[in-house]
Every structure is written in C-alpha cells, then in structure tokens.
Design a protein with these regions (language model features):
Chain B
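Alpha-helical segment of the N-proximal tetratricopeptide repeat
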Residues: 25-49, 138-152
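"A position-specific structural signal for the A-helix of alpha-solenoid helical repeats
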Residues: 29, 66, 105, 137, ...
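TPR-repeat structural position
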Residues: 40, 77, 116-117, 155, ...
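Extracytoplasmic/secretory-pathway proteins
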Residues: 48, 98-99, 105-129, 133-134, ...
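Short solvent-exposed coil/turn linkers within tandem alpha-helical repeat scaffolds
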Residues: 51-60, 87-101, 114-118, 126-139, ...
Length: 274, 512
C-alpha cells in the first residue's frame, strides 16, 4: 500500500501545549497575525503566508480547493456517547455553522437521542441485584467556536486526492439528562408508612462546557464528511440523583449543585456548504 | 448438307450467345434482388461477378455502384471506398452516372473514418468542375483541395478553397482552422485569432472536436506570443486541460512567455514540472537551455552551470543511440515505422536511450494517421474473414484484401518517411542545443556575462500582470493555497509550481 502522507500548509499546532484551551487561545492570537492568504497579495512580495514559506525554494501557489469563508454549513450526523458503561446513547444531530473565514467559525449543534440499556446492566441486576446510577443523555444543545489550524490533502492509492481540514472546537450549552429513578433506587417498602415515594422520572437540563476536535473530508466543492470527538462536562445538581430527596434534605445533608459529569461523544456526519 | 450444318452451327452459336447474355442480365437482376432483400454479402458477390464479367458498360457501371453500396451496408467502409474511388477518379463523364453520388459517399465515409490524406489527394487529381461537385460533398472536396494547396504552400489558393467549404459541413471547422493558420502566416494576426475563436465557439462542448479545440487554443496562444502579448498567450495556454496530450506543450511554451515578461520564478516553476519524474521520458531538451538563461538573467551563475551539466548528463548518452537509430533506418522507412510501432506496443529492445525521441515520434500526426489507417484496415480484414467467407471463388475477397493490404502498406511507407524526417529534425535540434550549451559555458568561462545577457535581453513586454501557479493570473477575490515542495512530487501539483528565488543581479551591482 502506498504511504498516505498528509501535506499541511498551515501547521500551527504546538506540540508543547497540552491544554486545548491554551491551544485555542494561542491560535486566536496567532490568527490576528496571519490572516487567510488573500489573492490581493502579490505572491512575489512579502506577506504573512509568503513569510511562512520564505525558506521554501519551490512552492505551489494556486486557488484554494475548498473555500469556507463566509459560507454556511448545514449538516446531519449520528452522535454516540462512548463512556457510559451501562447504556448505549445514540443521538441524531443537526449542525449549523457559519464560517467567518477559513479558520474561524461559529457552530451550533443540537442532538436528540435515545438510550438503550446494555446487557451488563441487566446482568448486574438479575444476578447480583445491583442497580446502577445512569446518566441518560436525552439532548445536547451547544454553541461553539471552531478553529481550523490544518488544511491538508491525502492521496489515495488510486491516485485520487482527498482534501481535509482539522479543527478544534470549544463551546457552551446545555445537556438534558433523563432521570429514571427505578434504574438505581430501591422501590419504597409498601409496609413502611414513612417511606418516601421515588421522585417522578424527569429530564433536567444542566450547563455544559465542551471541547473537541474533528476533521472534514471534502468530497467535492460543496460537500464534506465529518468526524469528530468531543469532551463535554456538565454540572448537575446532586440532589437530582437522590432517591429520597425530601428525607435527605430533612436530615440536613448537603448536596453540591455543580458536580461535574463528563461525557465523550464521537460524531460521524455529512455536511453541505452554501 | 454442308449448308445445313453451317446453319445449325450458326444457330447454336447465336442461341448460346443469347442465353449467355440473358444469364448475365439475370445476374445483375439477381444482384439487385439480393440487395433489395438486404442480403448484402450475396449481393456484393453477385455485383462483383457482373462488374468483372459483363461486356455491357452500363451494366458494369451499375454493378460497380451496387458493389460499393453492398460493401458499405456490410460495414466494410474502407472496402467500399475502393469502388467509390474508382468511380470518382473516372471523372464527371456521361457514361459515369454515379460520379456525384460516389463523391458524396466518400465524403460521408471520410467524416466517420479517415481515408487518409494521400488517398484523398490522389482522388482529386482528376479535374472536377465546381458544378459537378454535389452540395453535400462540397465540404469534403474543397477541404481537401485546400489541404493539398496548403501542403504545396499555395496559401492564397488554399484559403480560397477553404472559403468554399459550406457552413454546416463537417469539414467547416477544419477549414476555418486552416484559414486561421494561413492568416497568421500572412501576418494577419487579428484575423487569425478571430478564425480560431470561431473554431472554439463551434467546438465547445463537442467532445469529438476536442483535439481541434485544443489546437485552436494553442494557436491563439501562439499568435499572441508572436505579437508579444505574453499575458494573453499565457491565459490561452492555461485553458488546455490537464489530461490533454497538449498540456505539457502548453506548460513548456508558456515558460517562454513568462520569461519574456520577466516572471522568472514562473518560468522555473514550469520547467520544474517538465523535469518531474512524471515526464522523464518526454522530449523537452530546450527546457535546460531556458532554465540556464533564466538563471543567467537572475545572475545565478552556479545554477547556470548546473543546468548545463544536467543537460549534458541527460542527453550525452542519448546522442549515440539517436545517431545509431537514424543510421540504421536510413532508406528503410517501413522498418523505422515498425520500430516505433514496437515501441508503442512495449517491445523495444534496441536504442533504449533514444526513448524520449521515439516516444515523441510516436505522437506526431503522420504516425497517428497511419495507426488509424492500420487499425481500420485490420478491423476490415478481420471482418472479411467472416463476412467474406461465403463468397465463392474468392475473387472479390482477393480484390478487397489486396486493396486493404496495399492501403496499409502505403500508409506505413508514407508515415515511415515522414516520421524519419521528423526524427532527423529532433536529432539536429539536439545537436544545435548542445552547441548552445557549449557557447553559454564558454562565454561564462571567458567572463563575457554582459554580452551573453545582452543576447537574451528582454523587450518592453507588459510585465505588470501577476501570475500564480497553473498559468493563472492573480485574481483579487481568490483565496490561495500554498504547498511547499519538499522533494516529493504530487501529481495534482504539477503545473502549479512557482519558484521563490530572488535575482542576485542587484546584490552583485551593490557589492561592486
């Protein structure tokens, strides 16, 4: 098989920066210095891009294959949560992005999905009588800023070229968790008159912070496939996970209102540029 | 008694003559009947019998026409062209009633499969009055009369003939193209461009005319180059599609245009494409010379020497093989043709170092035309094995086969001669370029750099235009992408290279 080597014209990733936030901040600052190469620049005169290639004796200069600047991107995708041990969560996702320029974009995503219990959950309950606390993600709504530091291409063994870009994203939003108390709470004893009834199953929304990264593969000048991995942290109210909240409150037990729970999602989708 | 026997003998003779005549008449009728029943192989055989044996001229002529028509219906167009050509060569005379129709049929066949220029030129050696050329055959007739005159360098006559090609004829675009060439040769550049533009408009979105369209683009570029409108020339070269056989020629020719508008980095970028491993067997020896003089213009003398060295390294081994090859096939055009044919089929065993010239020769028009003729004749010869197997006696089969074999043989001979001549030209070009490299090196060694640079001085061409890679002018609304070349050639990057190398001339002046 032929080696598939990417070539990147805009490699600004600094391997020394481990934090994505720091990387985004760095990228933001850097973008103020290096704008997308506008054709108004004379390829023979110094410019930010020319400066980047000042030591390159021979270079290819041509119109960019895929322009995103000032274009809308609408997409559909399938999102899956990867780190919930006892359920599968699949969410249908709609994506709407506006690309401010080739590097920066604002993106809104809305995911809504279903949760399926895994076999492990059933085995634990049936064989060991263990009930598991589960965060059933019902929806995610996020608004993010996206930065694209890498634009590259791959050559397939057939000789066909696939252009791609790699982006980083960070944003805020809300995650809706469906609480199903019979998942993990013991039903109150019917013989105990003081027993507190289980809370009613409900979907509750929590503020969410998200970071991630992904790639678009441009199949033509209007369509791309997307692949991304995101890390979401939402802050939930501990009392929402309590089986007997009234009793707990009465005993003076303290409940944190911002306990973090992390979710990792993987997304595969297709989007179209307008 | 003797009288009686004499009378009886005379009667018998008459009767037999009558019978035989009725038999022949019956054969023609039978042939016609077979043709009407669409039994074309049998009809062809029957017509051939009449054509060969009938003593009646009128019937013979009819059988000749019927034979050609039957063969054409059998999809043996080349074979049919033999009999149509016999009719046409006889000229417009009263006892040749099918002259006009045969001419028309030949025109139709030739627009589908090329009959070959030499065949057609022979055909029109016969003097034909304008009135005798039927409307639908006028394009065919005047186009080839024009081509013949053009070959004889009678430009005005050729132009008149091409002018007579009616609009709507399949030959019209070819005629306009030739008129464009003539106009340019006559120094009427604007008219030449206008004519090539007409061809472009006529060939747009018609894949069957792709070659003509590309040649028109190349010619518009060349005319612009000739009148020193280099930026326009480059924009036309830039319209040649990447998958075209003409694309590398466009890259090469535009390198010169860039040179004359002092876009040396674009010149060097184009040469970088030509010298890429993708084109290592392509014959562009002059690219090294242009590279050297471009470096010379940039006062990069070490790189001039390097270019000259690379020319020498690459072409010195080629000289011996080319010389050997040309000597070996001197006076043997058929052998030379076969040698190139073998190269195309991948079975070349000798003169391997001459490969890039052999490759170039395998792409010249004369060779390609002959290859078409061989392909069509072979196809018919194969078809005849099955279609002609029912022909009794084999006389028709032999007649047609002989014609096809002879046509093939003539095409090979003619192409062999023309290609050999072309090969000699390339060899002379190599020699000339070799001398040029020696001159450049010698002048450099003598320190006559100013003289040398003056020899290649550039005029007051428009130097304002800015170009990116791919022969494209800078467009202010475009976003560009940059890829560094790091020793690895990517196929999609070919043609887009631009050097990033400043001239050293100012530095040298300053240091003095």
């Amino acid at each position: 098989m032929k080696a598939l080597l990417p070539k990147c014209s805009k490699l600004v990733l600094d391997s020394g920066r481990s934090s994505l936030i720091a990387l985004l901040a760095f990228a933001f600052i850097e973008s103020g210095l290096t704008q997308a190469v506008e054709a108004a620049e004379d390829p023979g005169t110094p410019s930010a891009e020319a400066e980047r290639f000042k030591d390159t004796e021979i270079r290819v200069i041509r119109p960019r294959y895929f322009n995103k600047s000032k274009r809308f991107e609408l997409g559909a995708a399938m999102n899956a949560i990867m780190n919930e041990s006892f359920i599968y969560t699949f969410m249908a996702t709609g994506i709407a992005t506006f690309h401010l320029n080739e590097e920066w974009a604002i993106e809104g995503t809305l995911s809504y999905g279903l949760n399926l219990d895994r076999e492990d959950k059933r085995v634990l309950f049936d064989e060991f009588d263990i009930k598991t606390q589960i965060f059933r993600t019902q929806y995610q709504a996020e608004l993010a800023i996206q930065y694209t530091p890498i634009y590259g291409k791959w050559q397939l063994p057939s000789g066909r070229l696939i252009y791609f870009d790699t982006y980083l994203t960070a944003g805020l939003g809300q995650t809706g968790i469906e609480w199903k108390y019979d998942d993990f709470c013991e039903a109150p004893s019917p013989t105990d008159p003081n027993a507190e009834a289980l809370p009613t199953n409900a979907v509750k929304g929590y503020p969410t912070f998200m970071v991630g990264g992904g790639q678009r593969y441009f199949v033509n000048r209007t369509t791309s496939y997307r692949f991304e991995i995101k890390f979401h942290r939402f802050l939930f109210n501990e009392i929402d996970a309590e089986c007997t909240p009234l009793k707990a409150e009465a005993t003076g037990q303290q409940f944190a209102t911002g306990t973090a729970h992390d979710v990792i999602t993987i997304l595969l989708g297709i989007s179209r540029f307008f | 008694m003797a009288r009686l026997s004499q009378f009886a003998a005379t009667f018998l003779l008459l009767a037999s003559a009558l019978l035989s005549s009725q038999g022949l008449f019956a054969d023609y009728k039978q042939a016609k009947a077979l043709y009407s029943k669409k039994n074309y192989p049998k009809a062809a055989e029957a017509f051939f019998q009449v054509y060969e044996k009938s003593p009646k001229k009128v019937e013979k002529r009819k059988a000749e026409w019927g034979l050609a028509q039957s063969l054409e219906k059998m999809n043996l167009a080349y074979s049919a062209s033999k009999y149509y050509s016999v009719i046409v060569r006889r000229g417009r005379i009263p006892e040749n009633p099918f002259f006009r129709s045969a001419l028309e049929e030949l025109g139709k066949i030739n627009s589908r499969i090329s009959l070959g220029q030499s065949h057609i030129v022979q055909l029109f050696k016969t003097e034909i009055r304008l009135a005798d050329v039927p409307g639908p055959a006028r394009g065919f007739y005047f186009y080839y009369k024009g081509v013949e005159a053009f070959g004889d360098k009678s430009l005005e006559t050729a132009d008149k003939h091409f002018e007579m090609v009616p609009s709507g004829s399949p030959y019209q675009l070819g005629a306009l193209f030739h008129q464009g060439v003539i106009a340019n040769l006559q120094g009427r550049h604007s008219r030449a461009i206008a004519l090539f533009e007409k061809v472009l408009a006529g060939t747009r979105d018609r894949s069957e005319y792709r070659e003509l369209q590309e040649m028109s683009l190349m010619n518009i570029a060349r005319v612009n180059y000739e009148i020193k409108r280099f930026a326009e020339a480059i924009s036309y070269y830039g319209q040649i599609p990447r998958d075209s056989e003409n694309w590398l020629d466009a890259i090469w020719e535009s390198s010169w245009a860039f040179f004359f508008i002092e876009k040396f980095n674009n010149t060097l970028g184009n040469i970088h494409t030509i010298h890429s491993p993708f084109f290592e067997n392509r014959f562009y020896p002059e690219a090294y010379i242009l590279q050297a003089i471009t470096f010379l213009r940039m006062c990069r003398f070490d790189q001039v020497k390097e270019s000259m060295k690379r020319f020498k390294d690459r072409y010195q081994p080629v000289f011996g093989d080319v010389r050997g090859m040309m000597n070996r096939y001197k006076g043997d055009p058929k052998g030379f043709f076969k040698f190139i044919y073998d190269y195309r089929s991948g079975s070349i065993t000798s003169y391997r170092k001459a490969e890039e010239i052999v490759k170039k020769l395998s792409q010249v028009d004369a060779f390609k035309e002959a290859m078409d003729t061989i392909r069509f004749t072979d196809r018919e010869l194969n078809a005849l094995k099955s279609k002609g197997s029912s022909w009794k006696g084999g006389a028709l089969l032999e007649d047609v086969t002989n014609f096809l074999e002879s046509k093939k043989s003539t095409a090979i001979l003619d192409a062999g001669q023309r290609v050999y001549k072309e090969g000699n030209g390339y060899y002379a070009q190599l020699l000339d370029l070799s001398n040029q490299t020696k001159l450049i090196v010698a002048e450099m060694q003598l320190g006559k750099l100013a003289n040398l640079r003056a020899l290649i001085s550039i005029g007051d061409a428009d130097k304002k235009a800015q170009f990116i890679g791919g022969l494209q002018q800078l467009n202010i609304n475009q976003t560009l992408e940059f890829w560094p070349f790091e020793g690895e050639y990517w196929e999609d990057e070919l043609g887009f290279y631009v050097y990033n190398m400043p001239s050293k001339c100012n530095v040298q002046k300053d240091s003095k």
